[in-house]
Amino acid sequence: MRKTITKTLSLLCMLCIIICSAFTTAGAASYPNDVKTESDSILLVNMDSGQTVYEKDADSKRYPASTTKIMTYIIAVENIADLDNTKIPIKQSVLDVLKNTGSSLANVENHVGKSMTAIDLLYSMMVPSGNDAAMVLADYIGEGNVDNFVKLMNEKAKELGCENTHFANPDGLHDPDHYTTARDLYKITTYALTLPRFEEITNTCTYTCDAVSYTHLRAHETKYYYM
């Protein structure tokens, strides 16, 4: 069967609070810090000029949740030479760690004992924010040890100049030792935008790969529907 992944809101739509390319240079003057906002941390940057338009607690540590997967994407793309043809085995043991965690899933478990291409797993991770796809990629690149993958994530964060970021897992599940800042996330995302297919994948609303058919609907309460 074929699998269709559909999302009504992009996984990365939340990044509008930290990245903005719509501001022209003429209108790039910083806004006053008394602007009313709901988010705890904000960094709004003109991507054309690199000028900060507005910021609020941009260096305070926050839990990144699913935006963690931006770094997971970076490590995956930099360590898999052929995204379209590399086949990655799906192991039940890797997926079992997500049970009872309330994880968002991409139905990867339907492929246990089989393989999926790296590109299908990247779409499965980024479009419906599939923690299962993130774990499979991390296990593969970490050669059977997800901790090896997480080490690569932290090394990359330092390389990118992140000063208040530490990753504890590849999927973003809550951990007191798993944090970043709006400024660091801006650095990570800016770098990700230079990598192959990142912008293409994160702008995708529907993706079809060889798997079971289901429809994924996202709203504020994050519900999943399979059919």
Residue ranges of predicted features:
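Conserved small/polar residues in nucleotide/adenosyl-binding loops
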Residues: T215-T222
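Acidic/histidine-enriched alpha-helical segments
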Residues: R197-A211
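Bacterial Sec-dependent N-terminal signal peptides
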Residues: R2-T6
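Short, solvent-exposed loop/turn motifs
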Residues: S115, S213-Y214
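Sec-dependent N-terminal signal peptides of Gram-positive bacterial secreted proteins and lipoproteins
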Residues: K7-A26
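Active-site-adjacent loops and short helices of periplasmic peptidoglycan-processing enzymes
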Residues: G27-R183, K187, A192-L193
